[in-house]
């Protein structure tokens, strides 16, 4: 990333010659090699995202998340996806909370590679904040919570479930 962003206009070149050609048999796992194409497509998508950034402009958490998801899309063995992701983010990160809302599977299918979880700090959670977050997660149909200290999120969650 540093080379690309701070390279002074230098083009980053990749050598794909050591990647097994498409269709080569995989002895250990079975199946056939996908060849270099999935990696090439991944790098083109990531380069497109980076080009949209002004030199030195920081990536948003969602942009970083999408880059990792594109990389996961490129991880294939025998034609089968071999990557699993979990993205942990601040519970007040609106972009990450809503990244699987709407028709994301059509506009950003790479996001399907990740389990997205909001990190909650026990001493900072209010019932109102949790309920708002819970409602947003229910609407998107995706996402979980990770309580980094204690079980306050679980306590509130149980209370919410019992009051429905």
What are these regions (language model features)?
Residues 1-18, 25-28, 32-164:
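Conserved catalytic cores of very large enzyme subunits
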